[in-house]
């Protein structure tokens, strides 16, 4: 609010965020998109701090340009969790994914299903949900086994032999070498 008692656009962002938060039920989770200016504006630093101090801001994901048809500006995905475990009450996971995307066109970016799974894996590990992460690694192993015959030779053998997470690096290097030879 300025001296004329007018609410600024960025102040309106926090009015909306607080309104949204106040209607979230106990134990509920919610996510929404906000302009990146709502995340880094100095004018609303105190409001942002109060919101974070509730312990219910769970994850913030910074998204780069061109993710929406009508706006090309970056944004931030906010996720609230009123059922957040006590051990995480003083923590907020911030993921900078502004350069993690696939270009669909010169004016539109998106996340592939695998990129979404990777972003989800970061959140799962932050929340201590190791089983979901193990399931994702198993899906990667299965996919590597499906792709192995396409590469043949040393690359195919290394892809077929993937077992532990440490086996991915040599398999990846062999696969890249096989691609370069084509």
Each language-model region and where it sits:
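A conserved structural/catalytic subdomain of Rossmann-like adenosyl-cofactor enzymes
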Residues: 1-182
């Amino acid at each position: 609010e300025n001296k004329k008692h007018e609410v600024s656009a960025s102040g309106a962002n926090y009015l909306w965020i607080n309104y949204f938060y106040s209607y979230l039920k106990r134990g509920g989770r919610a996510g929404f998109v906000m302009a990146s200016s709502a995340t880094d504006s100095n004018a609303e630093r105190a409001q942002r701090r109060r919101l974070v101090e509730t312990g219910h801001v769970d994850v913030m994901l910074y998204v780069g340009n061109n993710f929406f048809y009508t706006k090309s500006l970056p944004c931030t995905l906010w996720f609230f969790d009123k059922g957040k475990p006590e051990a995480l009450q003083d923590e907020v996971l911030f993921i900078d994914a502004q350069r993690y995307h696939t270009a669909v066109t010169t004016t539109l970016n998106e996340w592939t299903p695998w990129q979404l799974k990777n972003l989800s894996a970061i959140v799962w590990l932050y929340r201590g949900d190791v089983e979901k992460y193990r399931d994702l690694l198993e899906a990667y192993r299965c996919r590597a086994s499906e792709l192995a015959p396409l590469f043949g030779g040393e690359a195919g053998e290394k892809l077929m032999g993937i077992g532990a997470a440490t086996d991915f690096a040599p398999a990846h290097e062999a696969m890249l070498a096989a691609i370069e030879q084509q």
